[in-house]
């Protein structure tokens, strides 16, 4: 009996020693390796960017196909299974365009074909409130061509607001006050970072997402399509012609305008002419003709090792490739960072790293026209993605300048903070990115993903997938112009390409933790706190209107309890582990808990979507109705409040109350998912 016991004991010791001797390094080893200088390569990043930006490569062009081939070649050279998914989407290109006072062959994607001749009215940034100001001044916009400046809202909303005000055409220019480095002895590119007076910001004026001829379904070959006339009825494309123009032409037109002097906050820099509202007497002739074509390619690759754990759970990294011009900042700084991530992962693979979950790398096309490549792919794969994707990690323009910026769905806030604590600030070697990001505050400012500005939109706002978006710097003066090239990046954006390397480090580190950790690093307590803040803000907006927010506050309270409970469950499972976990792990329990964490975000969506904007299913985050770039919390409630304030009827406020109940039910559904119990 004693001999048997000794044999068993010796066997246990030997087996344990063997396990320790031959077990792979801990995940933390690979995390440190990933962000080390041994794997990062700023020279390679620079070479990627230089190759990608040799030619302007708008979506559907031969140059963009070459850029796609380059991305694919890098991915395949890393021994990753890669492929291209193609979609036949409707894109527009200029056939002819003319405007007295301007010569540059610039255009608006999905701009309306047509001509417009009329007196000019200056409308500041073209916001709804700017038209209210003009109305109060007695300025009639009807029948005019408006002159607006970039800077506050999405250009498509500028054109839409002009149409709603009765204008017959729209010109949008880049004012030196906003993009040209100010006045006096100001310098511009190539001597400084600022947009030259000849610079033109091009872009799309489409207010929707995805191919406008296939709303809600994928643009596959031979699929159903709605007609151009039906597209116009949706209100997502402009109904008046528009053109972007440079500041030098904007000022020439401005000098032709008389009438009342515009308000002080509508004026330009001190060297600009006096800005007046008009109308006229200057009259402009604007004509624009487009052709449509069908084209789109999305190179994608899988990085996966099928093991016994969770190969059917996906962590997706995405960036778009197409650019209006050379695209050194937007978007190919992000593309170069994506390729840097890929090459680091290959080096880690050679050192024994294997992910627990599948990592999927995507390089989207036609983002600039309206998030088209990512949206079509999401629409085609909706059910699979909804059931299997853990998180979508987006980087659009990786580097604009200095300073780290991030936006996320709130359950990922803590993970972002932890990742930035591990990566050195490229502009201050004595600090981590987190320390520079926080600055003098107690906590970093993390934005939210309600705006429609990049490829996270379909993942978050349509399906309800947790997501992150990140960059260094926020906005750059040569945005969407011919000056967004490699020289600008090398001189003013990232001299040594260390910011690119830092973005790749944070991006990949977040992905590694999501792909490798046994428990998904989600914390829904952050979500509950964020909803509480948003509800408090909403309380001020509906004060005295007879609206009860009690259902909303109660649902948030339940979410706090559910988030606390699932956090405690994770701790209990970890606490119960020990040497026994070497022999047997309860994989089903871990899997079930992770599924609850993954699926909870989906419960914030509603199958009916937002009223009048049914593609947007997420009831917590969606774009502002009058600014596609603007992020709103509780967008359905906010839309209803805006409508009620305009209509001033009891029935309209009942609609607000209904929207409050809808959001409250969604928050309760999230709590049920986290609790993992049927009612």
Which residues make up each language-model segment?
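Noncatalytic luminal/extracellular "stalk/propeptide" segments of secretory-pathway proteins
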Residues: 24-34, 38, 50-145, 150-152, ...
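Second-shell loop/turn segments in exported
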Residues: 32-39, 53-62, 106-111, 122, ...
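Structural recognition of the beta-strand scaffold that forms the well-ordered cores
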Residues: 48-51, 84, 120-123, 145-149, ...
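Soluble metallo-hydrolase cores and metallopeptidase-like ectodomains found primarily
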Residues: 101-133, 207-328, 343, 348-351
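Metal-dependent peptidase/peptidase-like ectodomains
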Residues: 193-261, 312, 364-490, 496-500, ...
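Alpha-helical metal-binding/catalytic segments enriched in His/Glu/Asp
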Residues: 317-371, 376, 507
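His/Asp/Glu-rich mid-to-C-terminal helical/loop segments that flank catalytic regions of hydrolases
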Residues: 360, 476-534, 645-679
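C-terminal amphipathic alpha-helical interaction region
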Residues: 586, 590-679
